[in-house]
Every structure is written in C-alpha cells, then in structure tokens.
Amino acid sequence: MIKNLNLLLRNFVCLLFLLFVNLFFSQIDNEKFTVVLDAGHGGKDPGNRGNGYYEKNIALSIALKIGKELEKRNDIKIIYTRKTDVFVDLFKRAQIANKAKADLFISIHCDAHNSNAYGAGTFVLGLHANQRNFEIAKKENSVIFKEKNYEQNYGGFNPNNPESVISLVLMQEEYLDQSIVAANLIQEFFTKNLKRKNRTVKQAGFIVLKYTYMPSVLVETGFLTNKNEGKYLN
C-alpha cells in the first residue's frame, strides 16, 4: 500500500507540473505559481469514517506529501489551508487562497457510499446534475453547521436545499473553463496513470469552491467505505 501511495504522489506531482506549464502558460516570468492544497475536514470535523478510517487524517496526509514534493521546485509556491488536525471554516479556506492570490485551489477529500463503490472523481463548482452529486455536496457542505455564525457567513445558505446551490455558481463562473480543464487533467491522470475507475468530472455545489477567485477543483480520491480502497488510501 505504501508503494501504491508513493506512486500516486509522484505521478500527481508530475501531473500538476504539466498542468502548470500547459494551462497557465501566461504566468509572469520569474513569478512562482501558487497552489493552495486544502486538506478537507479536520479537528472536530472528522469527515467520513468508513471502515474506521478518518477522512480528515487521510486528506491531510495526502496534502502534506504532495506539498512536500512540489516544494522541491523553485517555480512553485505551496500554501496549505491546514497542516495539522485543526478545524478550519470553509469560507476561511477560500480566504487563505484569495489572500495568497493563488493560481490554483485543490480541495482533497475521500468519498463514502456503499461498500461496492470505488474509484476517484473530480468536481468543479456547478449545479447538481443528479441526486448523487447533490448528496456528495450536501455531505461536504454540512460542516458549516459546526461553524459559529454560519447563517451570517453564508448568507442563509442551506446545504439541504438544492435551490440554495444556484447562488453558489455565479461567483465562480469566471474561472469555470479553467477549472474544468484542470479537473479533466486530474481525472485523466487517475484513470490512465493509476488505472483507477473513472468516476468522471462532475459539477456540484460545494461551498468551499464558491468563494475562491481562481480555478478550483475538489478531488474525491476514493471511497473509505470500500475496504480495499480504504486500505489503498490509508
């Protein structure tokens, strides 16, 4: 399993570098390309706990290891929304990225469904195409109920109401095309390089992607509810 994870990390770093070169070729000379790695959940929010694994721990481990590899490059600057097991409000994660004027925001998560579901999927902000996408976003967005003053911070947004999602989409529309390109490259990497089941690029209403003023994606690296995939990710 360690060998598989190391392979994942090495290939993911290569993928991101190619993404930087091909997608963001207009980057100013000598200016570092800034990537924000957002380890989902943390602290009092464990995320999903399929098969006894903690999503918050696995997401953090992946983010730190990818960041460590990317930090070896002089032309890339890495910023983390968290580097320890702490709780960070969703809107503050976006604030970190915006303050850094980041070029790319990647939120790292693990999925949960039934024990047979497996594979990796990548999301960009958008309207839910189906009930399953809505349920995934609702699960990730429900963390706001753990935050203080969440009603004021998110303008009355209700994760349980599909109509609330419409207002989310407008702010990220400017970056949607680049987000989709990035998501497609990440998804292609998962399926072609790591031979993971292709759960495709999807759109859903994730709050964490709403307030970022840059291309942004959310990666569901696999299903902790699947025993084999849980071991793979852990």
What does each model-found stretch correspond to?
Residues V36, G47, C110-D111, S164-N234:
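Active-site-adjacent mobile loop/cap segments within catalytic or ligand-binding domains
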Residues Q27-F157, Q172-N184, E188:
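Catalytic-core regions of hydrolytic enzymes
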Residues I2-V13:
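Bacterial N-terminal signal peptides that target proteins for export
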